[in-house]
Amino acid sequence: RNGTLLTSESGNRYEVVSLLGAGGQGEVYDVQCNGRHYALKWYFKGSATARQKNILETIIAKGSPDASFLWPMELIVPAQGDLYGYIMPLRPKNYKSIVDLMKKRVNPSFYTLCRTAFNLTRGYQKLHAMGAKYQDISFGNLFFNPDNGDVLICDNDNVSFDNSKPGGVLGTP
């Protein structure tokens, strides 16, 4: 709920500002801490498993491969209940989804498209170079700045650093 106060495992206090959206695993909220806005992914009951929490703890400990990933930063685990979530950077509003491109809601230059492709490839290469794999590639998880081709890759809570099977999602078939 808007106005709800949550404390992270590291002691930071976040206030829920508004619901941004929902997916198969949970809801994403705009939250605020010390005057800065972040995104909070809050898991639904069926997705808030011990396995998913272990995956998140590993991802947070390893750190982001680079700034193109909206990487989990810290966990929010209330003292009561089985549900939890994590904090990540908030995507700037000027970034558009690949779906926006496919539906022609944005019309970047050919140069920007090439830079977007290069930056996506470079981001995944950096992820793989640190021994990880991204397990949720879908059109809704890739964003780009239509002015310069910078990219943001979200939904990184299913990244794996071992040979485990995918978590709760399988990406785009």
Label each residue range with its predicted role.
Residues 17-18, 24-75, 98-100, 105:
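ATP-binding glycine-rich loop module of kinase domains
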Residues 124, 128-146:
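Catalytic-loop of the protein kinase fold
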Residues 70-116:
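Conserved structural core of kinase catalytic domains
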